[in-house]
Design a protein with these regions (language model features):
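Extended, charge-enriched "interface" segments that sit outside catalytic cores
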Residues: 1-97
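Glycine-rich phosphate-binding loops that contact phosphosugars or nucleotide phosphates
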Residues: 94-226
């Protein structure tokens, strides 16, 4: 095994590991001992990318579950993102922009963090404090359900009430969309938060409420959200 102290990709990305090698640091012998394991890991990643299968990656029922996240950047039929699916998302975004005042995403783990990361990158912490013009008409965005935090739910609900009062001269009802995200449809934290917001919004004359559930659409799965 030979090392050039630098890895250069065609994209121009350069990883310089010169200072990682040497006395008191990583030795060539250390990496040589790991070569077989690294080759095995490389083969597993290549298999996952080509077939969508990963060793011992199972659903809750014990059956193999496909792993397709490596295909997300490639927009084509047969991949998670297709021209048709992306157009649906764009149409959905246009609908939210023109019809919805606030969106509350409800999920645990990846169902929570995936959207939250995109929000933090694209919008930032001051988004919900901006006026409609600065938000270019897009709704305010909130996240809940990552844990059973009644205080956090109440804080978001109070903020929705605040904005609904300030929107009253412009429109009779403040439109809220709830988006519970759970493949099984039975995630406790997600359902608890969803029920809280759904009941709180429907009890008030200030709100119109819509629900868009992200869940398993297979009737045999029996998702309560479907």
């Amino acid at each position: 095994m030979e090392f050039a102290n630098k890895l250069v990709l065609n994209s121009g990305f350069v990883f310089d590991y010169t200072n990682m090698l040497g006395e008191g640091r990583i030795k060539t012998e250390d990496l040589q001992e790991m070569e077989t394991a690294m080759q095995k890991a490389r083969d597993a990643v290549n298999e996952m990318r080509s077939s969508g299968t990963a060793y011992n990656h199972l659903s809750k029922d014990g059956t193999p579950e496909p792993v397709y996240f490596t295909r997300l950047p490639e927009i084509k039929n047969g991949n998670p993102n297709t021209p048709v699916s992306l157009q649906k998302l764009k149409d959905f975004g246009d609908y939210l922009r023109t019809n919805v005042d606030a969106v509350v995403f409800l999920g645990v783990g990846g169902s929570y963090l995936g959207n939250k990361v995109l929000f933090d990158i694209g919008a930032g912490p001051s988004w919900n404090s901006m006026g409609e013009k600065r938000r270019n008409g897009y709704p305010r965005i909130y996240f809940s359900g990552n844990n059973l935090d009644a205080g956090q739910c109440e804080e978001i609900m109070n903020e929705l009430r605040y904005w609904s009062v300030h929107a009253w001269p412009k429109k009779k009802r403040f439109k809220v969309m709830l988006v519970p995200i759970s493949k099984s449809g039975s995630t406790l934290e997600t359902l608890a938060s969803f029920i809280y917001f759904y009941e709180a919004c429907n009890k008030s004359v200030m709100f119109d409420t819509e629900v868009t559930a992200v869940t398993d659409r297979n009737p045999e799965a029996g998702s309560p959200l479907f």
